[in-house]
Each structure stands twice: as C-alpha cells, then as structure tokens.
Amino acid sequence: MLWPALRSVLFQLDPERVHHLAHWALHRVPPALARARRPAPVPALAVRCMGLDFDGPMGLAAGFDKGDVALPGLFGLGFSHVEIGTITPRPQPGNDRPRLFRLPEHRALLNRMGFNNEGMEACARRLAALPAAARLGPVGINVGKNKATPNEDAASDYLACIERLHPYADYLVVNISSPNTPGLRQLQEREALDRLLRACVRHLAERAPGKPLLVKLAPDLSPEALDEAVDVAIAAGAAGIVATNTTLSRAGVERHPRAAEAGGLSGAPLERLATEVVRRCYARAAGRVPIVGVGGVMDAEGAYAKIRAGATLVQAYTGLIYGGPGFVGRVNAGLARLLERDGFSTLSDAVGADHRQGGGKAAG
C-alpha cells in the first residue's frame, strides 16, 4: 500500500528526473541483496526459449535501461530477463526536452526520447565490468542506428553494435520500429528488412554461432505488411519476433491535453492493439519462431492475454512505472493462479491457447 502514496509524490516531479532517480537507486543494489530480495520463482512459469532458460515469462522491455546497466537492481525486482537499450554505435543526446509525458488517467506514457544513450563503447565497458553474480537471468541488448546515419547505411550501424556488444548479450534485438527516429520504420519494408536482417544474422552467426537475434516490429503496420515482415524476418534467419513497439495511434486518449504531442504511446491504451499484433504474428509464424509480447502489460491478466495469443515471453516497461517495485511479483502470482484456473500445468502449455480448439477456458 506504500507504493500508491509514493507514486503520487513522484508523479509531481519531471518524468525524466524520476527515471534518473530510479536508476541511481537501482545502481546501488548489490548482487547479493538483489538475489536475497528477489521474489521466489514459480516453477510452473519457467520457460525455455531460443536455447535460453527463463525462470518466468516477465522481462523488462528496452527503453528503461539504456546502457546504464543497473542489472542487479532490475533483476531484484523479479524480472526473468532484462533487455538493455536501445544502444547506438555513437553517443547521442536524443530529442529535445520535454520528451517524456505521463498520462496517469489512462495509465500511459508518451515519449519521443530518440535513442538517447551513451553509445556502444560505454555500454560495453559497463557490461564487461559487471560481476557474473549480477546476471540473475538472460540479458538482451536492443540495438539501433544513429539519427545521423541515412537508411542506406543503416546496416553498418547495426553491424557495429552487434560486433561490439554480442559478447555481453544472451540475445540481441534489431530495433527498426521506434517512431522517434526519422525514417527508421521504413526499414520494416520488405527489401530493406531482408537486406538488413540477413546481414545482421550472418554477422552474428560468424562471431557467436547459435546466439539468437530477434527483430522488433511496430504495432502500426497494416495486417498485410505485418505478415510480410514476419515472413521476411523468419526467412532471413531471425530467431524471434518482438511485438510490439510504441504506437503512433492516440485511440483512447484523443481528448487528453498531451494527445497532440509527437511520439509513441505506451501503457494501457496500447494493450489491445499489441495483443492483436502478437496474435497475428503467432499465427503467421506458425511455430517457426517464438513471439515476445510487449505493449500495455499492466497486470497479470494483460500478460496472460498475450501468452494465450501466442507470446512465449512477455515484457513490460510502463506497467513497472505505474505498478511500482512489486509489479513483477504480483504479475507472476496472478499468472500462476490463471494457469491453475484454466487447467494448465506449465506456462508453455498456455502459449497460443486461443488458437487451439479446447485450449483451456476462455481468457478472462
């Protein structure tokens, strides 16, 4: 009950200032304390995916830790995996402030951060200095291109990040779907996507055979474009699909004073759209690669909806902002109850249940 009171105080402050305060605190959590305070894993929620073991489905989405590497503190919150990034080859400040806005009435955030980060060298140094005990689960690294790099040269940026960062990642994600870097989403088009992913997959395979490389897609693609992107990604050798990024849609928040701000919307208003994208990606992939469901996961029911729609793993960011330090523990406890309610002995049994006749009781 303490979190709602603390949140009301923090929400009086600038969102980026609060973000930096949170990182400051998380950085100071020693690995031993993180391990001791971490919520106990629920055996039924364990997942093996892409050759990696996850003690539950709930991970931290890219965007929260942009290379500051506060891994012990983040794993201490209960996340099964943490995705760092987006990281670019060269440091860049991102877009002008203000660039992060809360929409508390809608449990949402609106951001136009623009891949602000200190670059791949700083990220690599921090990860190299991290003790092995700080890694309490798989660590992903989400990579992107610098704003100044034209799309025709984008592959060089992604390859540079893969080259420098792959030794520190359990998996990598090619981010071509942020709405806050001009022209970036054009890389989701068939020919550009095929060229980029084939180059990235080949480069990683030569340096770390078997290490998974995924691609993160936007929720705003047409159904036909989404099907095409999934087909191209799988044909190019991607190990999975991350669905989805933030949306340009303002459905559900049209009347909010911040609705006219540029940027991507995340949180509860994105939940239904993102789940439908997961559903379509799962159907199109037809078991060839796993789907990581992201977007509007604010509670156990939202996470479960994505799992039943086809997500093997689920990630959250905005849900943590609104749900506080106990967020992951509550989601995992709720997922265990929902699995039991629907007669599933393991989480893996529930993945894609909505696509199967007799796949357990109806969600909700």
From Swiss-Prot:
GO terms for biological process: 'de novo' pyrimidine nucleobase biosynthetic process; 'de novo' UMP biosynthetic process. Its cofactor is FMN. One of its GO terms (cellular component) is cytoplasm. InterPro entries: Aldolase_TIM, DHO_dehydrogenase, Dihydroorotate_DH_2, Dihydroorotate_DH_cat, Dihydroorotate_DH_CS. The active site is at S178. Keywords: Cell membrane, Flavoprotein, FMN, Membrane, Oxidoreductase, Pyrimidine biosynthesis. GO terms for molecular function: dihydroorotate dehydrogenase (quinone) activity. The keyword DNA-binding does not apply. It is an enzyme of class 1 (oxidoreductase). Pathway: Pyrimidine metabolism; UMP biosynthesis via de novo pathway; orotate from (S)-dihydroorotate (quinone route): step 1/1. Belongs to the dihydroorotate dehydrogenase family. Type 2 subfamily. Catalyzes the conversion of dihydroorotate to orotate with quinone as electron acceptor. This is Dihydroorotate dehydrogenase (quinone). The gene is pyrD.
